[in-house]
Amino acid sequence: MQCALYDAGRCRSCQWITQPIPEQLSAKTVDLKNLLADFPVEEWCAPVSGPEQGFRNKAKMVVSGSVEKPLLGMLHRDGTPEDLCDCPLYPASFAPVFAALKPFIARAGLTPYNVARKRGELKYILLTESQSDGGMMLRFVLRSDTKLAQLRKALPWLQEQLPQLKVITVNIQPVHMAIMEGETEIYLTEQQALAERFNDVPLWIRPQSFFQTNPAVASQLYATARDWVRQLPVKHMWDLFCGVGGFGLHCATPDMQLTGIEIAPEAIACAKQSAAELGLTRLQFQALDSTQFATAQGEVPELVLVNPPRRGIGKPLCDYLSTMAPRFIIYSSCNAQTMAKDIRELPGYRIERVQLFDMFPHTAHYEVLTLLVKQ
């Protein structure tokens, strides 16, 4: 992938950009095999990759510069701003949005937040695009609601320029820290969720719900999990750390009982909406802590699917699963180091199958799907 920002030494986020994709995949595979070297693996499936550029469905832009000349991108460690509107990881459809946002920031009088001076209002612009219909969700992260009335007043101009903006919100993040969003979300549009569709499964994206940033690879990850589950004698499963329900909604069949657990209420609202659309009545989604939910249950289903954040599922949940011993565990991980650590805490299981998904090209990161079977 060619990147003018990298060539000019202005951005180093894609540390592996100079390596061809096959080399990157090979290095990631070696890393994963090293991490799982202590465990016999029955089957290594071929790694899955997607496009090497234009694949991201989300942009998280720090807003800096002045109200007349805002910059959208990032801040270097020394505080120097860098405009990343031309980043080749973004699809071409993002360019007109960035182009319209710059004059809009001036029109609405949204002074970019100055970290050094602790002054200004507009901290971040968060943009998400649906692959299914090209609809977009735009979030303005502000320090306070001081400029809210001005923003509302100027908004019709932006909506006229960009009819693809289906969901527009303001998020209030008052803390002087590099935290992307606060708890308060104010909707400026009637529509509150973005419709997405992977493998004929309807999914919804709401402002404060996590959603994978590489749809081409994520859709293959969900489809693979579905294929693996279809091969197992399973009538009841849990989907822990389920997010908007991507795994559970793909794996569920009309006669399967499935419980999805996720701590974020916004994500659970999305999952419930999808389940209703699919007419799946035996699916239950609840906004709870996954570990607390699981460890309070007196029995387990045949299959427990986990998709934890980078820290992994942790010892308490590993101990519980070891004791209760479900027949199958499917572990989807964005951090193979913590996954390997967790598998060590599950001594009664063998690794049936492993597959690497290159969700983050040009970096050392990857996603991995592992099927564990009770010995």
Curated annotation (Swiss-Prot):
Assigned EC number: 2.1.1.189
Catalytic residues as annotated in Swiss-Prot or TrEMBL: C334 (nucleophile)
Reaction equations catalysed: uridine(747) in 23S rRNA + S-adenosyl-L-methionine = 5-methyluridine(747) in 23S rRNA + S-adenosyl-L-homocysteine + H(+)
Main enzyme class: transferase
Molecular function GO terms recorded: 4 iron, 4 sulfur cluster binding; iron ion binding; rRNA (uridine-C5-)-methyltransferase activity
Residues bound to S-adenosyl-L-methionine: Q212, F241, E262, N307
GO annotation, biological process: rRNA base methylation
Positions annotated to bind [4Fe-4S] cluster: C3, C11, C14, C87
PROSITE patterns from the UniProt entry: SAM_MT_RNA_M5U, TRMA_1, TRMA_2
PANTHER family xref list: RNA M5U METHYLTRANSFERASE, TRNA (URACIL(54)-C(5))-METHYLTRANSFERASE
Function field: Catalyzes the formation of 5-methyl-uridine at position 747 (m5U747) in 23S rRNA.
Designated name of the protein: 23S rRNA (uracil(747)-C(5))-methyltransferase RlmC
